[in-house]
Amino acid sequence: MYAVIETGGKQYKVSEGDVLEIEKLSQETEEQVTFDKVLLVKDDENVKVGTPVLEEAQVEGTVLEHGKGEKVTVFKYKPKKNYRRKQGHRQPFSKVKIDKIKLNG
């Protein structure tokens, strides 16, 4: 059984037991998190597709840790004008383990 969920403006295909890195969540480490924006659920014989979301489906998970991604360096310059700006960015993320996919109905 797998589901497609939306969180942080992105869509993820998840199964029970998966560990994924998603955009940072406000929950603390070891807290439960529930994803209500479930777009699709497929089990052994049935496929349910939402329009756009399935109201009767939920995906539950546990926040394992928070962290920062790889550093991205942004460098801007104007030739011949001695204008240079170097800036770095590390995107925060949350690592979540999918515990259960619930489909009521």
UniProtKB/Swiss-Prot annotation:
One of its GO terms (cellular component) is ribonucleoprotein complex. Pfam families: Ribosomal_L21p. This is Large ribosomal subunit protein bL21. This protein binds to 23S rRNA in the presence of protein L20. Keywords: Ribonucleoprotein, Ribosomal protein, RNA-binding, rRNA-binding. One of its GO terms (biological process) is translation. It comes from the Bacteria. Belongs to the bacterial ribosomal protein bL21 family. GO terms for molecular function: rRNA binding; structural constituent of ribosome. InterPro entries: bL21-like, bL21-like_sf, Ribosomal_bL21, Ribosomal_bL21_CS. Disulfide bonds: none annotated. Part of the 50S ribosomal subunit. Contacts protein L20. NCBIfam families: L21.
